[in-house]
Structures are given as structure tokens and as C-alpha cells.
């Protein structure tokens, strides 16, 4: 199973830290102006679906573009409001989760089904709020190779599908933030990761950010995405799915999944 996760991460990344998105801090503006449109066109050419994790603030700033993501057949999922570090008080956390949900629903005209933490963090309250809004999955944890049922409370309905994104090397950030690795070398790394996962009939989750700077929005790095998709499509039996579709399959076949309890 192949999930392509594209973290929109526009100017929310800077604005949330009190940094004006200008000059050397304007990388997030590239996401909306060039990176996301380029990725959408690439995905059309490759004929594969993806899940775009969108901060609520970016949905407010670029409603037409976020709506276009949905109309072109991709999923729009939640990714915080201002790409918060998620060290929030209970009321603030719930307010931001519900605010982002409302923004994305209004922009796309579709329900939001999943969430990925903008910082990799969550609290012991997060999943309960998500479930109360009708979400069926989270994609933040790093603790397993396959999807599972994550039980966060003692009630009958206190569980959610976890789609872990646990492989740091299947993310553009470490390659382009710290070393500006050539895309050709990143492609080889991603191929090696895929080969092992494919051999073991596993779960391949790729995470990219269509920004400039440390992201994958520029032409050579978007081509990297196309190259790994082409490589994957050359293997028998692979299937690309939106996260919400795979999560719904997991819900429908939950008896096949391991359950993990975190209280």
C-alpha cells in the first residue's frame, strides 16, 4: 500500500512562529505560488492520488487552491492551524482543531477525515477531539510499520485508526534541511526503502513539503517525486490510495488490525 502525504506548509509555518514570511523566510509563499500547483500537475500526469495535509491558516489564505486539491481528486486533511508546536492548553487545543476543521470543510465542501500533527506531537486529549469531529484516522505516530487501531480511552468508541509515518528517511525534510542532498541520491534512498517494504508486503508512506528551501516544491525535487512514483508503479500489485480511503478500509476490516492501548 502506497500513501503519498504532501504537507502544504505555506506561510503558516513562519506566521505561527511570529516571523514575517518575507525575504529568506518567504519559502512558504513558494508552496502556494508554485510548489502545490506543480505537485498537482505532476500527480495528474502520474495518475495517482495523494493526501494533502493542510494547516487551517493556509486554507484561509489560499481557499481556491485548497479547493482545487479536492476537486482534482485528492484528499485534504488537517495539519494544525498555524503549524503549532502543540504545547497547548486543553481549551486552546480543541479550539484550534475545530477551527481548522471548519475552515477546510467550508473551503472544500467535503468532510475532513484525518489529521497529522504539525510537529509530530499530540496530547492525551487530541484523539478524543478528532474522533468527536468524525475523523477516522491519525497519521502522527512513529511506533509501528503497519496501520493499527489506537485505543486512547476506556469507552467502546474510544479508538481511531493510526497510519504511522515512522521512517524518517521517507521524508524530504532531513535531506534538504540539513545537507541539501542531490535528488538523485534521495531517489536511491527511497528506492531502497521501498524495495524492503515491498518485499515484506508492507506499508509505504512518503512525506514531502512543496516549499522552496528545504522542501520539494522546486522543479528538480518535484521530478524526484515523479521518479519514485514511476519506480513504484513498475512493481506488480502496488496500490496508491488516499489516506482516508485506506483508513476506511482499515475500519471495515478492523478485526485484522492489531490494537494498541495508550491511556
Regions found by a protein language model. Give the residues of each.
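Positively charged, amphipathic and often flexible ligand-engagement surfaces
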Residues: 163-180, 201
